């Protein structure tokens, strides 16, 4: 499944002659699990989304998971990452160690070994062409859903809701 599945490749590349990955419409995401982040102790905590200059447009997040464990991550449009000649892992490390809102919160925190993971998210934003339009997600007898249809929200990076709705419609 997903944006790179054989069916999506066939619909997008072969039938509609569009690029499978357009870096202006894909976000890179990177996350790690951390223990002991100040303000995220115990089983209660708020989801935090922060817009930091080094990852703009994009954001840095803290998602408390319970028992003091936190999903810490960063996401940014791939095209802009390439222009900055940087990697999300490096950007995240810099935010954690140097940003005034976070460096004190991570002083005693410990990253869970092997928890770092990166991925790409296909945005449902308009593509190039005579008329800006979403990525082609259909053909005779075929309707792509979820990531295969590039239905990730370009603002939030969330796609589960759109995937469920598209599956229901299909």
What are these regions (language model features)?
Residues 12, 167-170:
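Generic helix-packing signal
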Residues 80-168:
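FAD/FMN-dependent oxidoreductases across multiple families
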